Amino acid sequence: MKQYNAIKVKHPDAILLFRVGDFYETFGEDAIKTSKILDIILTKRGAGSQSETELAGFPHHSLNNYLPKLIKAGNRVAICDQLEDPKLTKTIVKRGVTELVTPGLATIDGVLNPKANNFLASVYLGNNIGVSFLDISTGEFLIAEGSIDYVKKLLENFDPSEILISKQKKLNFLSKFNNNFQLFFLEDWVYQYDFAIESLCNHFNTKSLKGFGVEKLKDGLVSAGAIMHYLNETQHQKINHITSINRIPKDDYIWMDGFTIKNLEIFHSFSREGKSLIDVIDKTISPMGGRLLKRWVALPSKNIKLIRNRHLTVKYLIDNETALSSIQENIKEIGDLERLISKVATGKINPREVIQLKNSLAAIEPIKKLLKKSKAKSLKELSNSLDNCNQLRKLIERTLNEEAPVSILKGNSISSNFSKELEDLRGIAFSSKDFLDKMLQEQSEITGIPSLKISSNNVFGYYIEVRNTHKDKVPEQWIRKQTLVNAERYITDDLKKYESKILGAEERILKLEIEIFQGLINKMYKYIKTVQNNALIISQLDCFSSFAQTAKENSYCMPDIDES
């Protein structure tokens, strides 16, 4: 427990999932809490001794089933993994926290709502109040600064799952804002302007932030710097999908306070049977379209030109029913591009999801052609901005099997003929039946035993089974391993050599498939921004289609805008 205690003391506010063999174990108060949330058995380690402590655990392969429940219960979870192969060490296996999952930094599907962002916020109480929002599942990074009322409205509209605050400003924050949010407190030194600029410039690989148009938002940048620090502290270093930081334009939107949002039942109805505004108008098909629609409703635009452009686009889709139907059918084939490409950056994507990404990009091609033929200027502009990602699709197609499994560890993820070495190894590993049938025939002819049988188990590996009626014909060089009631089991040098060859091939196949898959992911990095842009365009198109569908169903007409 010495190793466990040394790691736990660094994460006192988190449930520590401690990898022991094939299980994640929790101890003490963590075990009591975990067993209640997950409804798993609570037992004791060292029962009756002075070191007795509560224990609860689950198989490591069930992490994605259990982790969402812990996070949804409002917990921070530190995942402590084995950092070396137990077979290669004679001492205690090295362990360390590989990820700290918090409510605001969740990338697991079971935690995330497909049609809602999951924002981590940071608030800095400076001359103004600086605030920033990051959704690590999509890469969206936003900053703003202003008065208490303005930041209150931002927090109410963006509804973050977690807010970062300086420890020294805790009471000040609580006196100004409600305490309905989940808060996490950082050391005061984290909220420094120079530290923030250095952190942000290092991440974006720039000398300044002028290119993002945020350099004047000093208090906002301080809050954003705290988010960058928090990402590093929680072991979230793979964040290439965070490609920009954008200012929230204060004057572009109508800002609604929490009271207004609640009483207009925009997102939640007062009654269980009732429907909110978003429930009524959301006809989006894709998760990312649903998220964007929610943003448009939460932050109504004041830009007259933008509003008119949206109206004309929706009118075109209403008047062109075939185009609307075709767009909707193709969007159905598109997965959550935004979150899939984020998983590429964070290294959390699996082979099946990469195939889903490829197929989603393929569905963009007919949409692009359809928009290009459109007479609506706005839709033609969207078409010009869409990228077919042909090279990326071909790369994935060459590398992965179309029926690739969820886990790379299950094997058969890599396409046949991609690697000669891999195909040769597969030939050795998967042609064992032919080889063993041939060996069986040869040994039957040599020994004169017609009823030989070759099988395997976890104890002896491969063996030859001889019925007792023929055991006097067994060659001297065969080694007896087990005596049964009606038969005896033997091994031979040739059989053991072939077994080693098969096991070696299977081990090498797995290692090679992992290497090839990781190589594919590395090659996909350069397409992140392109796919993110595609995701944004498809989201907008999905929202326009949703408005058109709602208008058709309810006989809405296009309003006139009076600027008087």
Task: Locate the predicted segments by residue.
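Conserved NTPase motor "head" modules and their coupling/switch loops across ABC/AAA+ ATPases, GTPases
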Residues: K473, L536-S564
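Extended, charged coiled-coil "arm/hinge" scaffolds of SMC/Rad50-like chromosome-maintenance ATPases
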Residues: N401, L484, E488-N522
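Intracellular alpha-helical coupling/juxtamembrane segments of multi-pass membrane proteins
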Residues: I307, N330, I334, S432, ...
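Flexible, glycine/threonine-enriched loop-and-boundary segments that flank and lead into catalytic domains
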Residues: D434-I454, S555
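Conserved phosphate-binding elements of NTP-dependent enzyme cores
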Residues: K2-A6, D13, I521, V531, ...
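Charged catalytic and DNA/RNA-contacting regions of genome-maintenance
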Residues: M1-Y316, S325, E329-K332, D336-A345, ...
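Cytosolic, long alpha-helical scaffolding segments
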Residues: L395, T399, Y462-W478, S555-Y556
